[in-house]
Design a protein with these regions (language model features):
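Membrane-interface helix starts
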Residues: 18-20, 27-45
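Hydrophobic/aromatic residues in alpha-helical transmembrane segments
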Residues: 93-97, 110, 145, 181-182
Length: 209
């Protein structure tokens, strides 16, 4: 079926160079994800765990039996990233990544995308990149907020918190890239979004037993 049969019309506006294809697909993917109320609620409530971690870590410091013991932010950042990975990042990958390619297949979007000078790499990077960006919002930003709160509350030195934040940044990048690549990859398994969603959930939770 040609793209004209799908209702597309010739575009008479400004044409951007092919090098911007990835950016265009990324913006489209982010816009499509933002229209989901699940994504909006996840981004909204993803800040609750970090506030809890700030309060609990502060309480732990105040009630510490050894006042001379130095505050170590590393385990707190590890627990925070783990909590965000198993909750907010999982939901984002499920809602915006695990059905991305299946959605395009069902709506014949490939006929539109690949009628233009769009390469498979540009398409995949754009689709995966949106999941990565959204996952960074719920992993890296909370880690940064936690580090800033610890500095403001004088829990640990600035140097220790900066080093811990750099370590958490690397962890957030690994988590976000993994979630983007794996979830979008699973979305190519089948045209059925229900199948790809189920496969993603099984992969994510079954290994944890």
């Amino acid at each position: 079926m040609s793209i004209r049969d799908l209702g597309y019309r010739p575009y008479d506006g400004e044409r951007h160079p092919a090098e911007q294809n990835t950016w265009v697909i990324l913006r489209h993917s982010l816009g499509r994800a933002w229209r989901s109320w699940i994504i909006k609620l996840t981004l909204l409530f993803s800040w609750i765990p970090v506030m809890g971690f700030i309060l609990v870590s502060r309480a732990a410091s105040l009630f510490n039996n050894d006042p001379t013991a130095a505050f170590d932010p590393n385990p707190w950042h590890d627990w925070l990233l783990h909590a965000q990975w198993l909750s907010a990042a999982f939901v984002i990958a499920l809602a915006s990544g695990a059905g991305a390619i299946a959605y395009d297949l069902n709506h014949n979007a490939f006929a539109y995308f690949f009628s233009k000078p769009v390469t498979a790499v540009q398409y995949l990077v754009g689709r995966m990149g949106a999941v990565v960006v959204l996952c960074l919002l719920v992993t890296l930003l909370p880690a940064g907020l936690f580090a800033a709160a610890m500095v403001a509350l004088d829990s640990g030195t600035i140097e220790d918190n900066a080093i811990s934040l750099a370590r958490a940044t690397a962890g957030a990048l690994v988590i976000s890239i993994m979630m983007g690549v794996c979830s979008v990859g699973f979305s190519a398994l089948n045209r059925s979004r229900a199948f790809t969603f189920s496969a993603w959930v099984l992969l994510f939770f079954v290994p944890w037993g």
